[in-house]
């Protein structure tokens, strides 16, 4: 059975979905997507379940979410292996992802009490109310952790949720849904709707949906924004990636700097929203030495299948089709005059395994300002730090920016001048924390950061003035007279 609608597992009635191993081509999951009628039924059930769920005491909602975290812990081996098989990521990475899912529960609880506490000051009070029915669109790069970062705070706030995972990671979503059911969620509170574009379109068009929480490409995010134009009553939270820059400024430990660059560019085969896409290196002998060392170390990165032993640092990208697009972007930069520092290889066209590629594009004209979601690192040389900041900000995106440098004053300047939601110093760009907001500006989002700030878009504030005493004020406003006909009464 493909979908979980109103507590029942059902076969789909929509388009056929087949998920294969990114490397071997083995079929891992198959079914049919949710039809428009099934999406409508799920929305209706969620709307019906919402009043009781929203009124349920917070402590009871918390207990269910904490039970889910305990079930994640118990089932971590099965879930981490499913993520690895679907995404191609090595085991060590997917085990870390499941741990992040577990940690998200306690973090979301703390965030709720910090971001959305009930406040009373005299006759004034503030409390927070859930939106209603929220649609969560999950990405494929972190198919467990990233949807979890929307679902957990949404449920804690008292919302009902319609979860549409990526069609490239249906198995992970199915396992997570079964764990939620075992945790004791009331019927109708959380629904799983598998499928591709048709299912997603049907979900967005549902009038019962009060908000959409999305993580994915800028193209899809912009499409969602256009579709919801003229509907300001609906919450829309978009996280859309970036063309992120990492600046290298005279590091005093070249190997440490190289390690940060590799972690920033090639972890998860370059399939993290905050991965470095552009590496900015000062012109001169020191910059040349850094790049030579980077290319030499990156050439030794072990690339392999999710279950290879010894474990690889980098697995495959999500599909052979994705590998083809990434490799085409690599070739396009060579054709445009880029200088290859480390050649990207695609050994088997039927496989999604790529090796890291590094190319100097300093002299390439009209370089596309796009997020290449894979292990392709573009080097740009700069003259001075002012030039470096100009290059870093020369993008329509604004998710992440980083600096490798021993000079604190350079980082202080970057904090003021960088146009990015995440700005790191001597840390990988991919080192985001759930205890901080996660999001960007420009084409990277719509000012609805997730992680620690997810509670903000899962509930709306209600302000109240209240008094138990009903009486006239001691002093009336000018022009009012309550003495008229008083004696006659």
UniProtKB/Swiss-Prot annotation:
Enzyme Commission number(s) of this protein: 1.2.1.71
Give me the reactions it catalyses.
Answer: N-succinyl-L-glutamate 5-semialdehyde + NAD(+) + H2O = N-succinyl-L-glutamate + NADH + 2 H(+)
- What's the superkingdom here? Bacteria
Q: Which Pfam family is one of this chain's hits? A: Aldedh
- Known InterPro entries for this protein? Ald_DH/histidinol_DH (IPR016161), Ald_DH_C (IPR016163), Ald_DH_CS_CYS (IPR016160), Ald_DH_CS_GLU (IPR029510), Ald_DH_N (IPR016162), Aldehyde_DH_dom (IPR015590), SuccinylGlu_semiald_DH_AstD (IPR017649)
- Can you tell me which residues form the catalytic site? 239, 273
Pathway(s) served: Amino-acid degradation; L-arginine degradation via AST pathway; L-glutamate and succinate from L-arginine: step 4/5
Q: Which residues form the signal peptide?
A: none
The UniProt annotation places NAD(+) binding at 216-221
Q: Which PANTHER family match?
A: ALDEHYDE DEHYDROGENASE-RELATED
What is the annotated role of this protein in its UniProt record? Catalyzes the NAD-dependent reduction of succinylglutamate semialdehyde into succinylglutamate.
Name of the featured protein: N-succinylglutamate 5-semialdehyde dehydrogenase
Gene that codes for this?
Answer: astD
